[in-house]
C-alpha cells in the first residue's frame, strides 16, 4: 500500500511522508496553497482589470523564495496556455547580490545566468546592497545622524565603502540583523516604486513568519507586525504579501527536492553551529532556532503564532502621524521620542522606540 502526502508518521517529528509515486499530488497541494493567496492578483479583485499589474519578487536565492518563483512561474505558464486567460500579473525578479550583504557569500554570477535561463518569462535585475544610496537618497541623511559619534559618513568614499562603514558601526548581533533587514526592505521598496510595482511578494514561510513575529515583539517592533507578517498595505505605499504563509519550511524543503532545476540555483542555508554561545546570537536567530525545533514537536502551536498575528489590523492613522526616519513605522507616541536630532539645515531625525534601541550608544 502506497502512502500519499497527507499521511503522516506517528512519530514526534510530524514530517510529511512523501513517496515518489505521490510527488505530483504533493506538488499540486503546495501549488494550491500559493494559488489561493495569489487569487486577488490573478483575478484583479478591487483593482484595474486593464493594463499591467506588476509585482516584485525579491529573490534571496534561498529555498523559500526560489520555490515561490517556481510555483508562480508554473501558474503563469498555465494561465497563458488558456484560450481566455485571466488578467493576471507580471512578475519582476530582484536579486540583491549576496556577496554585497555578507562577505562570506560568493558572487552569484553563474547562478544569476542560470536563473534567467530557467525562467525566461520574467524580467530580472541584480543590484548590490549599496545601490540603496542611488535608489533611496534620503537614507544618506538618516545614516549620518543614526550612529552619532559611532560613525562619520565620508561622502568621498565609494557607496560600498560608506555602507560597509555604517554597518560596521552597529555593535551588537541583534542590532546588526535588525539594521540589515531595514536596509534590505528600504532597497526593495525603492526599487519597487522605481519600476511602478503594485506590490512585493515576500518568500516567507509560516515558520519564518512565526519566528519574525516573536523576534519583532522582543525587539519592540510589535506595532509593525501588521505589515511585516500580514498581507496588505505597508507604510511605504506598496502592498506586502506572503504567498507561502500557509506552508511550513519542511513542506517547502520537500517541494524543492523534487525539481533538479531548483537545486542548481538555490544557495543552501548554512547549518546552525552548535558551538555558538547564545549571547552571540541575534534575537532573530534565536527565535528561528526556537521555532524550527519546537515546530517539529508542536507544528500546530507554531502555526497558531502566525495565524494569530495575521488577524492584527492596523489602526486608521491620522494624516499627520510621523513615520520613523529609518524603518518607516508609524509613531503614535512620537511626543515621547528622544531620538530626534536637528543639526543646522538638516531635518529632525525621528526614530521609533525599536530603532532608538539599535543605535550604537544605546546598545550594550
Swiss-Prot record:
InterPro entries: CTU2, Rossmann-like_a/b/a_fold. The keyword S-adenosyl-L-methionine does not apply. GO terms for cellular component: cytosol. Pfam families: CTU2. Pathway: tRNA modification; 5-methoxycarbonylmethyl-2-thiouridine-tRNA biosynthesis. It is found in: Cytoplasm. One of its GO terms (molecular function) is tRNA binding. GO terms for biological process: protein urmylation; tRNA thio-modification; tRNA wobble position uridine thiolation; tRNA wobble uridine modification. Keywords: Cytoplasm, tRNA processing. Belongs to the CTU2/NCS2 family. HAMAP family: CTU2 (MF_03054). Plays a central role in 2-thiolation of mcm(5)S(2)U at tRNA wobble positions of tRNA(Lys), tRNA(Glu) and tRNA(Gln). May act by forming a heterodimer with ncs6 that ligates sulfur from thiocarboxylated urm1 onto the uridine of tRNAs at wobble position. Prior mcm(5) tRNA modification by the elongator complex is required for 2-thiolation. May also be involved in protein urmylation. This is Cytoplasmic tRNA 2-thiolation protein 2. It comes from Aspergillus fumigatus (strain ATCC MYA-4609 / CBS 101355 / FGSC A1100 / Af293). The lineage of its organism: Eukaryota, Fungi, Dikarya, Ascomycota, Pezizomycotina. The gene is ncs2.
Amino acid at each position: 500500500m502506497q502512502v500519499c502526502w497527507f499521511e503522516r508518521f506517528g512519530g514526534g517529528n510530524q514530517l510529511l511522508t512523501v513517496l515518489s509515486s505521490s510527488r505530483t499530488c504533493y506538488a499540486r497541494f503546495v501549488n494550491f496553497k500559493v494559488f489561493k493567496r495569489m487569487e486577488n492578483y490573478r483575478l484583479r479583485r478591487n483593482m484595474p482589470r486593464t493594463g499591467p499589474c506588476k509585482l516584485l519578487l525579491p529573490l534571496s536565492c534561498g529555498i523559500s523564495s526560489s520555490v515561490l518563483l517556481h510555483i508562480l512561474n508554473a501558474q503563469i505558464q498555465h494561465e497563458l496556455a488558456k484560450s481566455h486567460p485571466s488578467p493576471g500579473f507580471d512578475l519582476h525578479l530582484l536579486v540583491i547580490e549576496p556577496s554585497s550583504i555578507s562577505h562570506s557569500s560568493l558572487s552569484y554570477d553563474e547562478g544569476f545566468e542560470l536563473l534567467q535561463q530557467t525562467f525566461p518569462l520574467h524580467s530580472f535585475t541584480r543590484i548590490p546592497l549599496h545601490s540603496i544610496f542611488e535608489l533611496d537618497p534620503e537614507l544618506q541623511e538618516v545614516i549620518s545622524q543614526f550612529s552619532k559619534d559611532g560613525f562619520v559618513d565620508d561622502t568621498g568614499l565609494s557607496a560600498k565603502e560608506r555602507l560597509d562603514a555604517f554597518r560596521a558601526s552597529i555593535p551588537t548581533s541583534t542590532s546588526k540583523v535588525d539594521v540589515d533587514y531595514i536596509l534590505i526592505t528600504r532597497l526593495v521598496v525603492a526599487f519597487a516604486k522605481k519600476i511602478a510595482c503594485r506590490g512585493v511578494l515576500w518568500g516567507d514561510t509560516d515558520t519564518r513568519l512565526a519566528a519574525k513575529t516573536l523576534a519583532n515583539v522582543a525587539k519592540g517592533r510589535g506595532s509593525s507586525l501588521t505589515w511585516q507578517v500580514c498581507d496588505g498595505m505597508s507604510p511605504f505605499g506598496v502592498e506586502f504579501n506572503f504567498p507561502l504563509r500557509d506552508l511550513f519550511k519542511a513542506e517547502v524543503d520537500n517541494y524543492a527536492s523534487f525539481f533538479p532545476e531548483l537545486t542548481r540555483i538555490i544557495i543552501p542555508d548554512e547549518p546552525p553551529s552548535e558551538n555558538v554561545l547564545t549571547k552571540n546570537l541575534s534575537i532573530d536567530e534565536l527565535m528561528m532556532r526556537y521555532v524550527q525545533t519546537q515546530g517539529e514537536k508542536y507544528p500546530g502551536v507554531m502555526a497558531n503564532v502566525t495565524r494569530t498575528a495575521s488577524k492584527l489590523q492596523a489602526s486608521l492613522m491620522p494624516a499627520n502621524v510621523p513615520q520613523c526616519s529609518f524603518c518607516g513605522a508609524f509613531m503614535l507616541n512620537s511626543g515621547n521620542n528622544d531620538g530626534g536630532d536637528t543639526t543646522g539645515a538638516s531635518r529632525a531625525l525621528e526614530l521609533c522606540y525599536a530603532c532608538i534601541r539599535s543605535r550604537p550608544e544605546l546598545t550594550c
